[in-house]
Amino acid sequence: MTEAFARAKINLTLHVTGQRPDGYHLLDSLVVFADVGDRVRAEPAEALSLAITGPQAANLPVADDNLVLRAARTLGGQGARLTLEKHLPVASGIGGGSADAAAALVALARLWQVPLPDPAAVLKLGADVPVCLEGRAVRMAGVGEILTPLAAPLPEAWLVLANPGVSVPTPPVFKALARRDNPPMPDDLPGWPTVESLAALLATQRNDLEPPAIALAPEIARTRAALAAQPGCLLARMSGSGATCFGLFAAEEAARAAAEAIGTQHPGWWVAPARMVG
């Protein structure tokens, strides 16, 4: 048996800078990961199959177009018994499906002893799959295929992730964008020696999908506000196309206290403290 961890992907920034003739949007995003996520296990079997377990399993029925199965098919026609242990909310803006696909590729490449597919094949699975396969902090551009490592390591930081229990499909959010030619991030991203300096830079940047997502799901604004109100929260913003929002914290204790407080105030929300992985 082989196993791979599918970390949550967090867009600290997400600038929509254009749209190609084929309809794909051009992005400029600072992407990190959180030390919370799903797990994909792969065991030898004659046929390819998928079982979904975990606290979020009921929200993701097994279907032939599941990204885990699609990822498996890109590696060939061999068999395997796959188990997806689902902890991340579905359609939540933190790359759950893409991270699961990337984890499936890693687990199956080990099981079958084959190389990972080429970048073009990975990108066909979804715009976030290449960055999830990379699994470290990068600047993501193009339609998701241009990944540039950061010039300096990110500071130690903690995140609180909160989702109000609302699934937000990505296409309607992009369709509701007011404009698609927004300015990118600065050409040069300096190093950030402290979490405070990182938060200061992030405060000057954006998630261009946040306004249209809030228009479609007003609960996102309340989620962001709940995070921003917590002691020690340096910045609160939506990740991806929503509905998950993140709060940036310098200290583990403050992050854990914030997660507990929000979970108590909003028992129907999904809330998780996590170390930021860069």
Swiss-Prot record:
Matching InterPro entries: GHMP_kinase_C_dom, GHMP_kinase_C_sf, GHMP_kinase_N_dom, IspE, Ribosomal_Su5_D2-typ_SF, Ribsml_uS5_D2-typ_fold_subgr
Protein name: 4-diphosphocytidyl-2-C-methyl-D-erythritol kinase
Organism expressing this protein natively: Cereibacter sphaeroides (strain KD131 / KCTC 12085)
Keywords, ordered alphabetically: ATP-binding, Isoprene biosynthesis, Kinase, Nucleotide-binding, Transferase
Physiological role: Catalyzes the phosphorylation of the position 2 hydroxy group of 4-diphosphocytidyl-2C-methyl-D-erythritol.
Pfam families found in the cross-reference section: GHMP_kinases_C, GHMP_kinases_N
UniProt GO molecular function: 4-(cytidine 5'-diphospho)-2-C-methyl-D-erythritol kinase activity; ATP binding
Family statement: Belongs to the GHMP kinase family. IspE subfamily.
